[in-house]
């Protein structure tokens, strides 16, 4: 079973799961997963992994995430996008400086409500399930906007590029931008350009080592101990500080955690193939 890590480009109006199913058929691989669900109406970068590499998602460099979005002022939809639009109201035209100032006001750390219709889990429950009891109204998530810039303003459409932390919903951000301009707003277009170090390159196979958000450590004893999953001694490692590391050996690598002078395997015997 070949381990593969690559970036696919999800088309618009297809769910991430349905797109994954098509990739499974294309590559004839049963065990395949993705990181970072894209809304059905959104398109762009989706990190794909197969077999053993599906266990690596939480260790990858996936932040910041960069998007290009188009916001339509004056439109209202509970989904905050082009699905189920309930009404459109005429909105006054703004000057460019007002738009830029409004966008820049969202830079930095902040709290955000996930959209009512989303797959985000809050306290172990999906946001759309919490919505039924209005619980979601009190559930905010911490996010950060690293960069945001105006690409084009052709009233009532604002197109902007934004780089954010994991967990940020661009639909919610678009709604908040519109609200700050004293109107409703929905996204009419959303494309994810990259997830941290990951960008679309025609599904090119990637070396996972280059994308791990971990420091390399070095095992100074017999690699056979790693291969057999034997108990590890902290004195056999070059770096002995607390932390999570990857260790290469033969044609494999392991992910270990050092804490309180003890070494624990997080993952082991992951075969390198790229």
What is the role of each PLM region?
Residues 133-152, 191-199:
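Pepsin-like aspartyl protease folds
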Residues 48:
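Phosphate-centric recognition/catalysis
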Residues 1-13, 17-38, 42-45, 63, ...:
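Accessory RNA 3′-end/elbow-binding domains used by RNA modification enzymes
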Residues 51-54, 75-76:
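Short, charged/polar surface micro-motifs in flexible loops or helix N-caps
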Residues 109-130:
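Long, charge-dense, solvent-exposed interaction surfaces that engage phosphate-rich ligands
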Residues 59-114:
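Acidic, low-complexity central loop/insert segments
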Residues 126, 156-197:
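Pseudouridine synthase
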Residues 10, 71-73, 132, 152, ...:
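Short, structured patches in soluble enzyme cores that scaffold and shape functional sites
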